[in-house]
Amino acid sequence: MIPVVALVGRPNVGKSTLFNRLTRTRDALVADYPGLTRDRKYGRAHLSGYEFIVVDTGGIDGTEEGIETRMAEQSLAAIEEADVVLFLTDARAGLTAADEAIAEHLRRREKTTFVVANKVDGIDADSACGEFWALGLGEVYQMAAAQGRGVTNMIEYALTPYAEAMGLTRDGEGEEEADERQYTEEEAEAEQQRLQDLPIKLAIIGKPNVGKSTLTNRILGEERVVVYDEPGTTRDSIYIPLERDGQEYVIIDTAGVRRRSKVHETVEKFSVIKTLKAVEDANVVLLVVDAREGIAEQDLGLLGFALNVGRALVIAVNKWDGIDQDVKERVKSELDRRLGFIDFARIHFISALHGTGVGHLFESVEEAYESATRRVSTSMLTRIMQMAQDDHQPPLVNGRRVKLKYAHAGGYNPPIVVIHGNQVKKLPDSYKRFMMNYYRRSLKVMGTPIQVRFQEGGNPFEGLNTKKLTVSQERRRKRMMSHIKDKKK
């Protein structure tokens, strides 16, 4: 499983700055979808060869009301379930009572915690950080998140034990190179074959009390009983095998499948980290939304994360029965307005309690998975690229036309198209979006994001041992060029 890093600390110590720096390599993917909220509290990071989930738990006051009451339940859950906690402090402000209250809470939890003294730029860092040793959480690490100083070393130190335990490999890539990595055609082919031999992993996610457990029980059959309060189920999602119409599935249940008597509980413990890990591990994500409440910011945040990791999407609007027609029209209008950035995802209106519309969900799940894993040949992708250029030529860059040469598959789930050419790194985002939409229409991709990446064509003469002209050869060359110009006149 991918490691989870939680950022903890009082307000204004630099958590958001560090969060943005860690996740910035993925922001461009979200920017391709206008209308998606950018105010995210969790995201996927890729730094120095490590991939991990980072969660900003929000600021904690540590006032006299007590830390337990001041922290949101989800922030507490994030600390409980994270693999690593980075406890940020302000080196310029020094040690505060709020810092001590947070440290006391973390000591009681016995979490793997690293104290980070942020904002050490422009001050005597060693003397400023000395007092933070009194927190009793071990070594104090210096960082200037705004400038990026100490960030990479901190992450490497914090994640190395987890990387070794989970078999993650360090490839030594820097931030830029890691994000630009492309699958070769051979790797993409192998990935596609691997996916064909595995069951479809379907993660059912959503806010508390939208009917995830009811829907899961409806899919599995009411007679299926899985005990929720077993050891281990509080941290990890439950993986349930299922066969339907000859297709094998694995349902990843983030809410926990309750006994029938408990399905209608009014309060459900929601775990952000459990949900994010389920999205990471899934092939297709089924987002359940309550028709009576509509799309919430939390839903948009989950959708943004699913897009970032390239998962296929299906949306189920639950509790559709018993709503007046005018309310239904209003809900549909809101969905069109707020979900325009994922117009490729199928939306189903269902009643998990009564089973209405549930069967059709699997048609969209299979369609999305087929789109995400369908093999497309290099010749087909190159032909579509040429058709797109005929419809809309690439722009001029410094007086020269950007030249696109050929395209091939770079990966699956999500489908990745790699286009090779000259000056492609200078292409404007508008043209990149045009190419992405052109491929989506041409390939009839439905239910999954599609990524188009551009790779600079190599210089075939680079590295050749070209000899420098002698003085006499240089003179002869000039005479020949002059002669050619005279003839043209």
Curated annotation (Swiss-Prot):
The gene is der. Associates with the 50S ribosomal subunit. GO terms for molecular function: GTP binding; ribosome binding. Keywords: GTP-binding, Nucleotide-binding, Repeat, Ribosome biogenesis. This is GTPase Der. GTP 2 binds at residues 206-213, 253-257, 318-321. It comes from Shewanella loihica (strain ATCC BAA-1088 / PV-4). Residues 374-458 form the KH-like domain. The keyword GTP-binding applies. PROSITE patterns: G_ENGA. It comes from the Bacteria. InterPro entries: G_ENGA, GTP-bd, GTPase_Der, KH_dom-like, KH_dom-like_a/b, P-loop_NTPase, Small_GTP-bd.
